[in-house]
Amino acid sequence: FSDGMLFTAVWEREGKMAGTPKEEIKRIADQFAFTGELVSCGPCGSGHINETYMLRYRIGEMGSIKVILQKINREIFQKPEELMENIAGVTGHLKKKVLQKGGDPEREVLNLIPTKDGKAFLTDENGECWRAYIFITDAVSYDLAEKPEDFYESAVAFGKFQEMLADYPAETLHETIKDFHDTKKRFQTLKNAIEKD
């Protein structure tokens, strides 16, 4: 298959990708500041909250870039503008920290792709919200730990994340899911569910 044929073949085989028709994905993608020509698209990942798509754009004769396009679940995130304000603020802060330490913010931090009018996300005519990130190539993620070392590496990464955010102005963050970080309340909810089961 050529890239164009692959793009068409995937859509014809699947008909719909994770619930959103192909024409809609193309139309939404066209509203972001992506570089290049869209040549392929398909569902991405194993998540259960947002609709996630992997898009590949051809840049020039030989190069290409992959991006992630996500439709934010409005049932879970009822104030997506606050969610995206949090993400933009935190990722901006992390990029500065990574640069200060001589790291590579393109690989170590999520990079939002703005809409063509410079916003962090898009609200379509149906009130659905979409965001886009540069895909980090050669990165690995796990749904389940495969060995004890995976737990260790997860803890190291989480510790590094917390360290870099130690001086972030937490008072500027919005609570995007009520009581999500209330450990006592979450634990009580778990206990109640266990008792009912």
Segments predicted by a language model, with ranges:
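Conserved ATP-binding subdomain of kinase catalytic cores across diverse folds
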Residues: C41-P43, H48-R58, S64-E195
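Juxta-kinase regulatory segment immediately upstream of eukaryotic protein kinase catalytic domains
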Residues: M17-V39
